[in-house]
C-alpha cells in the first residue's frame, strides 16, 4: 500500500481546523485532613466565607475558616467516603435552600431536602441561608397581634407580628407546648408557620409532626428537622434555613411565625464546630462570636413596610406589609437565666415568657411566671378588649403573689387583703389551660371579664376551671352572635361591657356548672 503525502497533509490540516480547544478554569484544592465532620483543604485560593464546596460523590460542604495556607470547612452530610488527597472544587455559590409555598405541609432537613417520604419538592425558588436583616428605614412598628390562643400569653405577655418573644425555662416545663399551641391557633389567621427542631430526639420531632397533623395545622406549617443524630453543622444551619423559608413569605407581604426549638442546642453545635476548627474558646468554651450567631438570626424577624415589600416583589404586591415573628426557645439549667446564652438571647429579643418548674409541678400550666415574663412591644399590638381586661388580671396576680408571701406569717388578715388573696387564687386557676385547646379572642375576653368584674368571687377555687368550661359551652350555644361580634371587632366600650355582663349574669342564674 502506497502512502500519499498530500492526502496525509490534507487530513492533518482538516483535523487542525476542526479542533476545538476548550480551556476550563476551575478553582480546586486537595483534602489535607478529614474527621469529625470537619475538613482541612489546601489550594483553594479564592474560596468565599460560607461558600458551598463540592466534594467527591455529590457531597457538599461549607467554607467557614479561611486561613493563609488552608481552608477549614464543615461537611454537610456523610463524610466516611472522603479521604486525604481527594479533590475539592469551589462552586462560586453561597449556601442556598429551597423556599416557597410548596414546602408547606412538608418535613425537610437543614438543606431543604424532604425527609417525610412524600416525594420531591418542586420549590418556587431558592434563597441564601445567610441574609442581611432589614434596615431601620425598611421596618414598620409592630401593631398587629399574633393570637396564641393561650389566655396567660395573650393577656399578660402579648405578641405582635414582627416581634421576637423568647420562651425560656428548664427542661420539661412546657416550652415546646406553648409554641405548638401558638402554631395550631394560626389555622384560620393566614399566618404561615415554620417549626425548626434543633438537636431533638427523632421520636420527639415525629410526635410534634403527628400532633400538628392531628389538629389540621401541618397544612400551614413547614417543619425543618435537624435531629440529635445529625452532624453539628446541620444543627447549626437548620435555624438559618428555616429563617430563609420564613423570609420568603415576609418579603411578599404575608405574615409568618417561626419557632426555633431550641437555640441552646444550636449554640452547643456551633461551639462544637468552632472548637474542631481550632477557633479560640471564650466564656463557657463558646467562641467569641456566639452573640452574633443569635443576633444576626433573630434580627431577620421583623415587620417590613409596604414600600419595601413593593420593592422586593418588583411592584407585584402593593400596599401590604410583611412580617416574620420569631419564638426562640432557650433551655436553662436549674433556672439559671444568668448563663451566657440565656443572657445573650434575652438582650436580643423583645421580651420573654419565663416558665417555672415549681409552677409546672404544682399543676399551673402553662407554667408562666407573670412577674418575670414581659413583652416589650406587644402591648401596642393587643386588641382593645384583651388589653383593657388583661391589665386587671396582671395586677391581680402581682398583688396576689406579694400578699401570699406575707400571708404565710400573718395570722389575722383584714377583709380587703383576704379578698385580694381569694381573687388572686381564682385568677391563677383561670390562667390554667389544657394543651391543644386554643381560645378565640371572644372566649378569652369574656373569661377575663368574668374574673375582672368579680363574677368568680363566689365560685369555689377548685370549681373555677369547670365554671369557665360551662360558661364557654353556654356562650357557644346561646350567645353565638356575641362571640362572632367580639371576634370580628374586639373593641372595649360600654355597649360591649353591657352585653358581656348580661351574658355572664344569665349564665350564672342558670347554675349549670
From Swiss-Prot:
Q: Which Gene3D superfamilies match?
A: 2.40.30.20, ATP synthase alpha/beta chain, C-terminal domain, P-loop containing nucleotide triphosphate hydrolases
Q: What class of enzyme is it?
A: translocase
Q: How does it sit in the membrane?
A: Peripheral membrane protein
Site positions for Required for activity: 373
Supply the alphabetized keyword list.
ATP synthesis, ATP-binding, Cell inner membrane, Cell membrane, CF(1), Hydrogen ion transport, Ion transport, Membrane, Nucleotide-binding, Translocase, Transport
- Where in or outside the cell? Cell inner membrane
| Gene Ontology annotations for the cellular component aspect, listed alphabetically | plasma membrane; proton-transporting ATP synthase complex
Binding positions (ATP):
169-176
SUPFAM superfamilies, per database record: C-terminal domain of alpha and beta subunits of F1 ATP synthase (SSF47917), N-terminal domain of alpha and beta subunits of F1 ATP synthase (SSF50615), P-loop containing nucleoside triphosphate hydrolases (SSF52540)
Q: Which domain of life is it from?
A: Bacteria
Recorded catalytic activity of this chain's protein: ATP + H2O + 4 H(+)(in) = ADP + phosphate + 5 H(+)(out)
Q: Which E.C. number(s) belong to this protein?
A: 7.1.2.2
Please list the GO terms describing molecular function. ADP binding; ATP binding; proton-transporting ATP synthase activity, rotational mechanism
Stretches that traverse the bilayer: none
Q: What does this protein do?
A: Produces ATP from ADP in the presence of a proton gradient across the membrane. The alpha chain is a regulatory subunit.
Quote the PANTHER family the UniProt record gives.
ATP SYNTHASE SUBUNIT ALPHA, MITOCHONDRIAL (PTHR48082:SF2)
Q: How does it assemble?
A: F-type ATPases have 2 components, CF(1) - the catalytic core - and CF(0) - the membrane proton channel. CF(1) has five subunits: alpha(3), beta(3), gamma(1), delta(1), epsilon(1). CF(0) has three main subunits: a(1), b(2) and c(9-12). The alpha and beta chains form an alternating ring which encloses part of the gamma chain. CF(1) is attached to CF(0) by a central stalk formed by the gamma and epsilon chains, while a peripheral stalk is formed by the delta and b chains.
NCBIfam families to which the protein is assigned, alphabetical: atpA (TIGR00962), PRK13343.1 (NF009884)
- Kindly give the HAMAP family that the UniProt entry links to this protein: ATP_synth_alpha_bact
Q: Which family does it belong to?
A: Belongs to the ATPase alpha/beta chains family.
Protein name (database record): ATP synthase subunit alpha
Which lineage do the record's taxonomy fields give for this organism? Bacteria, Pseudomonadati, Pseudomonadota, Gammaproteobacteria, Chromatiales
Q: Which gene name belongs to this protein?
A: atpA
Amino acid at each position: 500500500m502506497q502512502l500519499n503525502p498530500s492526502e496525509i497533509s490534507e487530513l492533518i490540516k482538516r483535523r487542525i481546523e476542526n479542533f476545538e480547544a476548550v480551556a476550563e478554569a476551575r478553582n480546586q484544592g486537595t483534602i489535607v485532613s478529614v474527621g469529625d465532620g470537619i475538613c482541612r483543604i489546601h489550594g483553594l485560593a479564592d474560596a468565599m466565607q460560607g461558600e458551598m464546596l463540592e466534594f467527591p460523590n455529590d457531597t457538599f460542604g461549607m467554607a467557614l475558616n479561611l486561613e493563609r495556607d488552608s481552608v477549614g470547612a464543615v461537611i454537610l452530610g456523610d463524610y466516611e467516603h472522603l479521604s486525604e488527597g481527594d479533590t475539592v472544587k469551589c462552586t462560586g455559590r453561597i449556601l442556598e435552600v429551597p423556599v416557597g409555598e410548596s414546602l408547606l405541609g412538608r418535613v425537610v432537613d437543614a438543606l431543604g431536602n424532604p425527609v417525610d417520604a412524600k416525594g420531591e419538592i418542586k420549590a418556587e425558588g431558592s434563597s441564601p441561608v445567610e441574609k442581611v436583616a432589614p434596615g431601620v428605614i425598611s421596618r414598620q412598628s409592630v401593631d398587629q397581634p399574633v393570637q396564641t390562643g393561650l389566655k396567660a400569653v395573650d393577656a399578660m405577655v402579648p405578641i405582635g407580628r414582627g416581634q421576637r418573644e423568647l420562651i425560656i425555662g428548664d427542661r420539661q416545663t412546657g416550652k415546646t407546648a406553648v409554641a405548638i399551641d401558638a402554631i395550631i391557633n394560626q389555622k384560620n389567621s393566614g399566618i404561615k408557620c415554620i417549626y425548626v427542631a434543633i438537636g431533638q430526639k427523632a421520636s420527639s420531632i415525629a410526635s410534634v409532626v403527628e400532633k400538628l397533623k392531628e389538629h389540621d395545622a401541618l397544612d400551614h406549617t413547614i417543619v425543618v428537622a435537624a435531629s440529635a443524630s445529625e452532624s453539628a453543622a446541620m444543627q447549626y444551619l437548620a435555624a438559618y434555613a428555616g429563617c430563609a423559608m420564613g423570609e420568603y413569605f415576609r418579603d411578599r407581604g404575608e405574615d409568618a411565625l417561626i419557632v426555633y426549638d431550641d437555640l441552646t442546642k444550636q449554640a452547643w453545635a456551633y461551639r462544637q464546630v468552632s472548637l474542631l476548627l481550632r477557633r479560640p474558646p471564650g466564656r463557657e468554651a463558646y467562641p467569641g462570636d456566639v452573640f452574633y450567631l443569635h443576633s444576626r438570626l433573630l434580627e431577620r424577624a421583623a415587620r417590613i413596610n409596604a414600600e419595601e415589600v413593593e420593592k422586593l416583589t418588583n411592584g407585584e404586591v402593593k400596599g401590604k406589609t410583611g412580617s416574620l415573628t420569631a419564638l426562640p426557645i432557650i433551655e436553662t439549667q436549674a433556672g439559671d437565666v444568668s448563663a451566657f446564652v440565656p443572657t445573650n438571647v434575652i438582650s436580643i429579643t423583645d421580651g420573654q415568657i419565663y416558665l417555672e418548674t415549681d409552677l409546672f409541678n404544682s399543676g399551673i400550666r402553662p407554667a408562666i411566671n407573670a412577674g418575670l415574663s414581659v413583652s416589650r412591644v406587644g402591648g401596642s399590638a393587643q386588641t382593645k378588649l384583651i388589653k383593657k381586661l388583661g391589665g386587671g388580671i396582671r395586677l391581680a396576680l402581682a398583688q396576689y403573689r406579694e400578699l401570699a408571701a406575707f400571708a404565710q406569717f400573718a395570722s389575722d388578715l383584714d377583709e380587703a387583703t383576704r379578698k385580694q388573696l381569694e381573687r388572686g387564687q381564682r385568677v391563677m386557676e383561670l390562667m390554667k389551660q389544657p394543651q391543644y385547646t386554643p381560645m378565640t379572642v371572644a372566649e378569652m375576653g369574656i373569661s377575663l371579664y368574668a374574673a375582672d368584674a368579680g363574677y368568680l368571687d363566689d365560685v369555689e377555687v377548685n370549681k373555677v376551671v369547670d365554671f369557665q368550661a360551662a360558661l364557654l359551652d353556654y356562650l357557644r350555644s346561646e350567645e353565638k352572635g356575641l362571640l362572632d361580634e367580639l371576634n370580628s371587632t374586639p373593641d372595649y366600650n360600654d355597649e360591649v361591657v353591657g352585653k358581656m355582663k348580661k351574658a355572664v349574669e344569665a349564665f350564672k342564674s342558670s347554675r349549670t356548672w
